Amino acid sequence: MKQVYDKFGLEATTRDFIGHSMALYATDDYINNRGMAKDCIERIRLYANSMARYGKSPYIYPLYGLGELPQGFARLSAIFGGTYMLNTHIDEIKFDGPGGKVSGIRATMKERGEEGEGMKFETKCTKILADPSYFPGKVQVVGQILKAICILNHPIDRTDNSDSVQLIIPQSQVGRKHDIYIAMVSSAHNVCPKGYYIAIVSTIAETSANHHLELAPGLERLGRIEEKFMGAPIPIYAPLESGVNDNVFLSKSYDASSHFETMTDDVRDIYRRAQGEELVVQGLKEGQGLVAEE
């Protein structure tokens, strides 16, 4: 991709914008890696096509917050015969003998505050797709997320008073190895009272102490903060193996990005490992990305 940038004489700041804000790369590795130009151009086209379709932004965000996404999954799952269970604890994962493949689970469904043992049940299966929290012995820590949730009473400066924004501060502009992400939503999304805004600043930890300093460039970009909440670093887990030996296929943890691009890559990866083929979305033409071209 460096040759493409050089051909058009693009400045460093323009390259940062294209690579990190449009193509959504988390690092600058794509610039010098061979064969990445096509992938980068497809990502840029997806961004441009999305802008053409939605107008103000290439992104769509659910009303009432991200909790609507699992609700949408639950409804779609039910249409295809799936069962979505809340307040359910996995008691045991069963395998066909030592070193065998997964064969089922034992679990207990119990509402919070409910007396008694709850509803115990057992179900058979041939594959399990799960996040790292269910199999702590099958994952490793590959990094840590730093995150601050801030309450504002004003829109972020120099964003045209937008009621929602995503800002990406490229790593090279703040002397870091990882980008800093800012996602802001407001009462327009029914997530807070009118006149208030919720901004989340996140990045990958690069030091073992003074984590608030790593988020400082993002926090400064917000302006005056009414209230700030920042917890301990959040571990990022990745599976130790593919899962083909025991048919337990694990996802990665969420990273610091605010646009879910890496999450969609993880979905494709876990599908490839579990099914042995690439994920093909029905009704989507090859090479079209996730947005139809006009």
Placement of each model-derived feature along the sequence:
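General structural feature for long, well-ordered alpha-helical segments within catalytic domains
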Residues: 1-4, 14, 36, 40-43, ...
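Short coil/loop linkers at secondary-structure junctions
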Residues: 9-13, 83, 225
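C-terminal catalytic lobe of FAD-dependent flavoproteins
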Residues: 197, 207-294
